[in-house]
Amino acid sequence: MSSGIFEACRDILALFSVGLAIKLMDDHLDREEADGARLPLAARLGRGVCAYTVLSYALAAWLKPSWAWTLFLASYACGMLGSGAWRLPSGLPGWLETVLAFALGVTAAGWREMASSTAFVMGVQLWDDVVDFAHDRYLTRANLAQRWGRVEAALAGTALLFIALFLAAAKTLLGLLVLPWVLYVAAAPWGKERG
């Protein structure tokens, strides 16, 4: 019994840590698009954001390597989906980095682990696009809910989350449980307002 509780706590902490690493990096990369009354945690960390992101990811990778690797790589691959033929700092086109990230995840943790992480990340991303539909219409790049339609994006997001649940029930359920806490901490609601 106690080993089961320990494992569940370890898994939750691993998911929180990798989720926070992904969110910090995403907020850092999207800092030009940030608005609102409060500074997110990534902005408050300033130049230290990369160090704290790596620290958070390292903790997750130590606690639950296969989940940390595949969730991070799936987030990276999904983040590159819209970049198509753009040349990235690596010199590679975005589509090739997407394929390489997915292949690395499959090699490191197996197809089922990588597929479940990819389905989870894409499902969450689609729902995020649905929720942010009104806000994101002012950005230069349309999100998927704007391209496909809100209902279509919501249905696709739900289907992907069910696929993730089928492939990796514990990771998906715990991930959905941890996600609001990651978003809360990353939003840093306890801090200063923009001035």
Task: List the model feature ranges, each with a label.
Residues 2-25, 69-74, 110-127:
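Membrane-embedded alpha-helical segments that form the functional core of polytopic membrane enzymes
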Residues 6-14, 48-52, 71, 93-100, ...:
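Alpha-helical transmembrane segments of integral membrane proteins
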Residues 8, 60-69, 106-115, 165-174:
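Transmembrane helix interruption/hinge and helix-loop junction motifs
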Residues 20-55, 123-158:
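Solvent-exposed interhelical
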Residues 26-35, 76-90, 129-137, 186-194:
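C-terminal ends of transmembrane helices
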Residues 44-109:
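Intramembrane alpha-helical segments
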Residues 86-97, 109-140:
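Membrane-proximal helix-loop-helix units in multi-pass membrane proteins
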Residues 173-185:
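Small-residue-rich transmembrane alpha-helices that serve as helix-helix interface/gating elements
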